[in-house]
Amino acid sequence: MLRRVAIAAVLATLASGCAAQGSGPAVRPSAAARDPRTMAALLKIATVFNNDYDRGVYGPVWDRWDARSQAVITRADYIRRHTECPDSPQSVTVEDASPGPGGAWIVDYESGGVRLHDYWFYVGGRWVFDLVLSNPDSVKLYRLSPQQYVAELGCAH
């Protein structure tokens, strides 16, 4: 009888150890997939990037920024500001991409009848958007307090 109790205790201990391990992820998440370093991939990524912005899906937009741009405003503040004070939706058409200065790729697009240019870089296996080069006016706005930001854009808050 004592032997059965000892075996049951050992089995219970082993089972609880297995259960504890099972509570975590079975497989570790892999590193982010690398983007192909091609113009076609960049055009596709830039199109998704602009479509996400137009639909108000701001998190993935911020996630595509380079480190210098992400240092301008936190992800949470970026999402909050755009959710509370959204831009008017505009149809954006990504048109072309070409190599630019200093390793940049310049993506040309049209928004509301205006031709614009964004700067993208290939860093660490990913295409990243450079807000500082592409839209320095937004950088100035993001550095304002939330109250100043709302007042500057004239949106209701």
Model-derived regions, located:
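Surface-exposed, charged secondary-structure patches
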Residues: 79-126, 131-138
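Low-complexity, intrinsically disordered terminal/linker segments enriched in charged
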Residues: 130-157
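C-terminal motif of bacterial Sec signal peptides marking the signal peptidase cleavage site
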Residues: 14-17
